Amino acid sequence: MEKTKQQSNKDIVLEAFDTLFNKRDYAKAERFWSPKYVQHSAHIEPGREGLFNLVKSIPATLKYESSLIVAEGDFVILHGRFSGIGLPVNWIAVDIVRMENGILVEHWDVIQDEATKKQSKSKLPMFGSSFPVYAKLENTIG
């Protein structure tokens, strides 16, 4: 069975994120991101180099996991977790990527700190089926 454009785009984005964030293979990652990559995130300098430089500045413990991915037209939306980022907490992110001819060309995101069970009013985890445990913070965060 032939893949749809949307399935192909999802597969490409997942491979791109794994290659850059988890494997840190910058040479291979260049083939996924356009040299004219447009970055809308308030956390990241402009362009592909801005993104790559951000990843280079984060500890090698960085890990990206995706729990949901949806594609519509040229857009791919991911719900994911960035852990090991050198901060006391993980980040939960929704990333929106626009694709052109199998290349990531534009990006938006919404990022927030991952809440512990003690912090969560809903008592439901923000990612996956369990809450994170932040040893240094669990006793101090209300």
Show which residues each predicted segment covers.
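C-terminal and inter-domain tail/linker signature
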Residues: 1-142
